[in-house]
């Protein structure tokens, strides 16, 4: 089965970017809280 590299990269970015954004917001909020 041929894997579309561009589709895989696009999917990975689509998942990783919001996850990283939420993680950064969480860390900033946690550091401000304490």
Swiss-Prot record:
<keyword id="KW-0150">Chloroplast</keyword>
<comment type="similarity">
    <text>Belongs to the PsbM family.</text>
</comment>
<dbReference type="InterPro" id="IPR037269">
    <property type="entry name" value="PSII_PsbM_sf"/>
</dbReference>
<keyword id="KW-0604">Photosystem II</keyword>
<dbReference type="InterPro" id="IPR007826">
    <property type="entry name" value="PSII_PsbM"/>
</dbReference>
<keyword id="KW-0472">Membrane</keyword>
<keyword id="KW-1133">Transmembrane helix</keyword>
<dbReference type="GO" id="GO:0009523">
    <property type="term" value="C:photosystem II"/>
</dbReference>
<keyword id="KW-0812">Transmembrane</keyword>
<keyword id="KW-0793">Thylakoid</keyword>
<keyword id="KW-0934">Plastid</keyword>
<dbReference type="GO" id="GO:0009535">
    <property type="term" value="C:chloroplast thylakoid membrane"/>
</dbReference>
<keyword id="KW-0602">Photosynthesis</keyword>
<comment type="subunit">
    <text>PSII is composed of 1 copy each of membrane proteins PsbA, PsbB, PsbC, PsbD, PsbE, PsbF, PsbH, PsbI, PsbJ, PsbK, PsbL, PsbM, PsbT, PsbX, PsbY, PsbZ, Psb30/Ycf12, at least 3 peripheral proteins of the oxygen-evolving complex and a large number of cofactors. It forms dimeric complexes.</text>
</comment>
<dbReference type="Pfam" id="PF05151">
    <property type="entry name" value="PsbM"/>
</dbReference>
<comment type="function">
    <text>One of the components of the core complex of photosystem II (PSII). PSII is a light-driven water:plastoquinone oxidoreductase that uses light energy to abstract electrons from H(2)O, generating O(2) and a proton gradient subsequently used for ATP formation. It consists of a core antenna complex that captures photons, and an electron transfer chain that converts photonic excitation into a charge separation. This subunit is found at the monomer-monomer interface.</text>
</comment>
<feature type="transmembrane region" description="Helical">
    <location>
        <begin position="5"/>
        <end position="25"/>
    </location>
</feature>
<keyword id="KW-0674">Reaction center</keyword>
<dbReference type="GO" id="GO:0019684">
    <property type="term" value="P:photosynthesis, light reaction"/>
</dbReference>
<protein>
    <recommendedName>
        <fullName>Photosystem II reaction center protein M</fullName>
    </recommendedName>
</protein>
């Amino acid at each position: 089965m041929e894997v579309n590299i561009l589709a895989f990269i696009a999917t990975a970015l689509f998942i990783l970017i919001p996850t990283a954004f939420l993680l950064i917001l969480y860390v900033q909020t946690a550091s401000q809280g304490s």
